[in-house]
């Protein structure tokens, strides 16, 4: 491969790496608050962050319990 082709490939890889989000940490949290703690067995992990929950649901943490819940809004 010529040095020009290699340089172009390196430039494209660098651009791709810059434009690809590393993780969901780059995303903002969804609006609203988590409702009161549910009655569930200990340490259920249904999600890791809001973006792993469908629609408007939030990933809510209650001790070692993580689950997708509909948000509540407080005025």
From Swiss-Prot:
Name of the protein described by the UniProt record: Veswaprin-c
Cysteine disulfide links: 34-60, 43-64, 47-59, 53-68
Domain of life of the source: Eukaryota
Gene3D superfamilies, alphabetized: Elafin-like
One GO CC term, this protein: extracellular space
Family in the record: Belongs to the venom waprin family.
InterPro entries xref list: Elafin-like_sf (IPR036645), WAP_dom (IPR008197), WAP_four-disulfide_core (IPR050514)
Pfam family, one: WAP
Annotated ranges, domain WAP: 27-72
Function field: Damages membranes of susceptible bacteria. Has no hemolytic activity. Not toxic to mice. Does not inhibit the proteinases elastase and cathepsin G.
